[in-house]
């Protein structure tokens, strides 16, 4: 039975654009060879990591959505685990198909609501009592 999966992996930030494209194509080919379908790849680009990984503060994020069986995902994860270029990866089984985001621009800022002063009435009790 075919399930929907999303794999997000982070490549080292010091890789050139050509090497990043080679790695993306490598994992796309690997998952295709294992009969995965509906493969969608989105390269997010270089982003700051939430915390250092292997003494690195940045990484190149790549999101891949596809349909496959669990047995087809394992060879790709093994290749990522053994790769020096991949610093972290995560594969999630999705309940439904989720399209990769079209634009990763910052969220629209919501203007702050006006601050209203609250009137506190004195109840006759002091903090010193």
From Swiss-Prot:
State one molecular function term (GO): small ribosomal subunit rRNA binding
InterPro entries, A to Z:
Ribosomal_bS6, Ribosomal_bS6_CS, Ribosomal_bS6_sf, Ribosomal_S6_plastid/chlpt, Transl_elong_EF1B/ribsomal_bS6
**Keywords for this protein:** Ribonucleoprotein, Ribosomal protein, RNA-binding, rRNA-binding
Q: Where are the transmembrane segments?
A: none
- Cross-referenced PROSITE patterns, in alphabetical order? RIBOSOMAL_S6
**Function as written in the Swiss-Prot or TrEMBL entry:** Binds together with bS18 to 16S ribosomal RNA.
Record's protein name: Small ribosomal subunit protein bS6
| Organism for this UniProt entry | Microcystis aeruginosa (strain NIES-843 / IAM M-2473)
Q: Which gene encodes it?
A: rpsF
């Amino acid at each position: 039975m075919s399930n929907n999966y999303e794999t997000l992996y982070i490549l080292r930030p010091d890789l050139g654009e050509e090497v990043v494209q080679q790695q993306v194509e490598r994992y796309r080919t690997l998952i295709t060879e294992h009969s995965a379908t509906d493969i969608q790849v989105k390269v997010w680009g270089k982003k700051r990591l939430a915390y250092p990984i292997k003494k690195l503060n940045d990484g190149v994020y790549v999101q891949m959505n596809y349909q496959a069986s669990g047995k087809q995902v394992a060879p790709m994860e093994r290749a990522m685990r053994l790769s020096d270029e991949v610093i972290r990866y995560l594969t999630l089984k999705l309940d439904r198909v989720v399209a990769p985001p079209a634009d990763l621009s910052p969220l629209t800022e919501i203007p702050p609501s006006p601050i209203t002063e609250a009137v506190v009435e004195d109840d006759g009790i002091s903090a010193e009592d």
